[in-house]
């Protein structure tokens, strides 16, 4: 809800009490944005909801509310429409004052959260000795955008990368490398990441087929857990090599993370089991220690347990996740913990959240949120893979997007007979390519699957990153064409609204805070994408020579006023795109 809506809501609540008494304090006035501008800007529907309780027709209730409603500083005289809707139209002077205020505000009128708190966003989380693939794309960029929005709202955000850096796979890989490439276990970067991944696959095949190899691999895991010097050194080298490769991707995507892998929680795993035992939740079932869950059954309809210690004494993902959760609440003092993973893990989160609640580990003031997302599909509607059927490497996907953006730009420059330096072309292609991939993902409702299409995401038309970047660059072009520095307009430059397209743009600019606040609550970045796309369209209509207004050739004071609207649009686009992890371009 934006500042204007907040004010109107308070005024309506006061009018309700004045008209019908104190018992109506706290009644929701049901204030919504008007669906049609001809009915005003906002509509309160509370009269219809109170008709039965008050035993009066909705129009009579609406009249009684309007009689006590004092919104003269904000709105024109309220009107009652239809069965009892209260329509509110913002005054031009009020709109102008609001725009002048955000023009002087570096945050564009977006307030910080009333109660800032420590929040954790757990995202990306690739596995050591494996390359990041298209499956990591969504977690990484959705998590990054959520973290950026929470940070902008003033929360203290810890961005955690829960890397898969522990487990049986290391015993398997180290055992295999001792045979085929022992130098990789003693020397940094003896292998490139592609070879490491290939050896991992070969090790897995050997592990599945050879019992003697399996036994040796398990002994290697025991040595690792016991801290054997050579095995621990080998493990650290393998982790560091993968870490370097991950960092290349994170740098390309401009994503910041604090790594805290599964191994970090190893010393805490026994205390998880002890804690569950002490709370009376732990049951031994076929030698394994587990907790039975409410609402989860197997195919036979029998209660489904969450295993926290295997019959051989080993631990699993659930144990690690429970240890991590306790640490994040007790040591990190997080008040909201957000996990960004694919929707296929929804049951896992529901299960270990339930166990933690039953154990009393989650205080009432701590919120746990699983942020699920759908699959990335190929244009055939199936899971996105290479032609050979392999999973698409994330690095290859990003490189291809940049390469295509490069080719598109060179083609456009040729058509425009325009010359640019190779450095300019490379920079623009990288920003456009990476931004296109990010925006194509973030603009979808994250709970849905989406089809990955280079052609669509790189299109200069439609709800795409290139369209947004072009809208921003176009406004910077206006300043260059007019020889104007927007920063020099100054806080004294006043907005004057006359034309319909000016009003439409102005009202939309004032909705940014409401949109960001909504995304903070529901963690759906596509809402911000929709807002920025609509804003770009409204600006293009405002600037259109047939539908809109003259800007540079307008007489003063309208010229300066319209330049302020241009500047506010550009700043809103820049801020909004930055919260999606997208940088803008002054020229394209």
Swiss-Prot record:
Pfam families: Arg_tRNA_synt_N (PF03485), DALR_1 (PF05746), tRNA-synt_1d (PF00750). Gene3D superfamilies: Arginyl tRNA synthetase N-terminal domain, HUPs, Isoleucyl-tRNA Synthetase, Domain 1. GO terms for molecular function: arginine-tRNA ligase activity; ATP binding. One of its GO terms (biological process) is arginyl-tRNA aminoacylation. It is an enzyme of class 6 (ligase). Coiled coil: none annotated. Keywords: Aminoacyl-tRNA synthetase, ATP-binding, Cytoplasm, Ligase, Nucleotide-binding, Protein biosynthesis. It is found in: Cytoplasm. A motif ('HIGH' region) lies at residues 126-136. SUPFAM superfamilies: Anticodon-binding domain of a subclass of class I aminoacyl-tRNA synthetases, Arginyl-tRNA synthetase (ArgRS), N-terminal 'additional' domain, Nucleotidylyl transferase. It catalyses: tRNA(Arg) + L-arginine + ATP = L-arginyl-tRNA(Arg) + AMP + diphosphate. Transmembrane segments: none annotated. Its EC number is 6.1.1.19. It comes from the Bacteria. One of its GO terms (cellular component) is cytoplasm. Monomer. Belongs to the class-I aminoacyl-tRNA synthetase family. NCBIfam families: argS. This is Arginine--tRNA ligase. It comes from Trichormus variabilis (strain ATCC 29413 / PCC 7937) (Anabaena variabilis). The gene is argS.
